[in-house]
């Protein structure tokens, strides 16, 4: 991507008027368009870590407290913000930082660190090692169109990915806020399923309590997808706000009318006017009414390498193919079930494509699976993985997501929230009803709410806190803050 062509004070004024310094370092995207300038994982996060190290190297001549750095991001930027929060000082990044020319030691010879204090993540696209399976369990299993048409190879793969996700949930043993281990006894039964249903109901009930009627539903703009060589937006947080207007709208005069619209195909929402709360019949009914699958089977690691994530794990210098497969779970299914799959319609053999890609090494000698681990927050947070407790994780996280989105499964963000909470971190998690893949907030402005969250953290830690000494740094998509 090219650098932004303009900087506009109005896009960052909300931060500056609060005494926050907005640092705009920039970072590589998934592809630079140049064979001699590699991008993708883990260079995007490496660039941001390098920026933090630069600021800390120069902390004596720059304003701000470099122990109070916050990041933020939306979508892929939300993932990078999360990674900045989770991967602090991870040794896995050392060789990349050195190749990047990052500051590794200060003038006195002390190691410079790249950990941060807090991360804001809107709709983070994370946990790519299981994202294909999570998408099929959360969304794909409930549909029978396109690549999920019955009696096709891809439908069979979808079913098997769904089963793999059940195995993963039972292996990772996440706990709910009450400390109960969440498991699946069958595909759609068990405490994990019940917890997801509870999250959906809480999101709906938040909407009911937050919303005044008459209420107008406005179709939202999609999050902008920058092409391989497109320009970054002007200086600022980026990403669409909660209610971008696409020109289509529907007004509901009463809450009862809105509930009736949800039940227009079948009754799956029950509203109790006495308690002003609602319940749902099942996750399936919610998904079928509120979410349409926008991705084929292989939602992130596409069988034909057609997704943006395939380019994230590509290698620019490999001119024959700068997109790579990265999902070992999908590969194992293709390999183990090939005889079953090849008897079905639409079959194509992708086994060699996967096996060739997964072990392709980059310029520092790391293969694709190593790079997937580096870009998987839960790799550092769960004892299911070898990376458990090998990084300095931020103390504070704020994760907001639109529960109607089809860009990723809701369970990906829920798993991230639970893993951080189980790790002992302070996490605010909000899944917002009637919001899609946007900077989702229950109420108010996303930037203002983010700033308020930071101020609340700093007030708690400093009784004499004042915005006059609230000094911070940010960057586009994933952004850096400093505070005094």
What is each PLM-predicted segment?
Residues 1-14, 30, 405-415:
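Short, surface-exposed "cap/lid" segments of acyl-processing enzymes
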Residues 1-4, 70, 397-398:
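Short beta-strand element of the alpha/beta-hydrolase
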Residues 4-22, 98-108:
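Short amphipathic alpha-helix adjacent to the substrate-entry channel of hydrolases
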Residues 38-61, 448-452:
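Alpha/beta-hydrolase active-site loop
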Residues 57-142, 224, 229-247:
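Primarily recognizes the serine-hydrolase "nucleophile elbow" in alpha/beta-hydrolase
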Residues 131-135, 173-272, 398-405, 414-417, ...:
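C-terminal catalytic histidine-bearing segment of alpha/beta-hydrolase fold enzymes
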């Amino acid at each position: 991507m090219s650098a932004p062509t303009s900087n506009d004070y109005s896009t960052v004024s909300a931060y500056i008027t609060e005494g926050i310094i907005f640092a705009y370092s920039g970072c590589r995207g998934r592809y630079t368009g140049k064979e001699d300038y590699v991008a993708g994982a883990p260079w995007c996060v490496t660039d941001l870590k390098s920026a933090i190290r630069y600021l800390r190297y120069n902390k004596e001549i720059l304003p701000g407290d470099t122990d109070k750095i916050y990041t933020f991001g939306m979508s892929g930027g939300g993932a990078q913000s999360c990674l900045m929060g989770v991967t602090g000082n991870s040794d896995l990044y050392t060789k990349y930082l050195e190749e990047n020319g990052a500051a590794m030691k200060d003038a006195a010879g002390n190691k410079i660190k790249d950990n941060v204090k807090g991360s804001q993540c809107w709709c983070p696209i994370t946990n790519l090692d299981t994202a294909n399976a999570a998408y099929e369990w959360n969304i794909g299993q409930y549909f029978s169109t396109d690549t999920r048409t019955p009696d096709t190879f891809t439908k069979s793969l979808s079913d098997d990915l769904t089963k793999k996700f059940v195995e993963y949930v039972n292996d990772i043993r996440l706990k709910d806020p009450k400390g109960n281990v969440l498991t699946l006894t069958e595909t759609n039964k068990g405490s994990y399923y019940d917890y997801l249903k509870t999250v959906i109901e809480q999101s709906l009930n938040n909407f009911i309590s937050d919303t005044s009627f008459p209420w107008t539903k406005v179709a939202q703009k999609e999050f902008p997808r920058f092409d391989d060589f497109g320009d970054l937006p002007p200086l600022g947080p980026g990403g669409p706000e909660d209610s971008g207007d696409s020109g289509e709208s529907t007004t509901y005069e009463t809450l009862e009318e809105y509930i009736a619209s949800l039940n227009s195909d079948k009754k799956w929402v029950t509203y109790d006017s006495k308690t002003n709360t609602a319940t749902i019949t099942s996750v399936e009914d919610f998904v079928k009414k509120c979410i349409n699958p926008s991705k084929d089977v292989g939602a992130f690691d596409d069988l034909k390498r057609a997704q943006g994530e395939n380019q994230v794990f590509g290698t620019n210098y490999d001119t024959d193919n700068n997109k790579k497969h990265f999902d070992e779970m999908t590969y194992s299914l293709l390999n183990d079930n090939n005889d079953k799959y090849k008897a079905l319609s639409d079959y194509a053999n992708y086994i060699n494509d996967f096996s060739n890609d997964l072990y392709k090494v980059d310029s520092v000698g790391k293969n694709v699976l190593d790079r997937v681990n580096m870009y998987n927050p839960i790799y550092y947070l769960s004892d299911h993985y070898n990376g458990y407790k090998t990084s300095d994780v931020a103390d504070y996280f704020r994760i907001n997501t639109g529960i109607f989105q089809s860009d990723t499964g809701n369970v990906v963000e829920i798993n991230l929230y639970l893993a951080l909470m189980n790790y002992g971190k302070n996490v605010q998690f909000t899944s917002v009803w009637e919001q899609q893949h946007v900077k989702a907030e229950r109420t108010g402005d996303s930037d203002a709410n983010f700033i308020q969250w930071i101020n609340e953290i700093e007030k708690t830690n400093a009784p004499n806190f004042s915005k006059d000494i609230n000094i911070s740094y940010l960057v586009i998509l994933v952004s850096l803050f400093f505070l005094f």
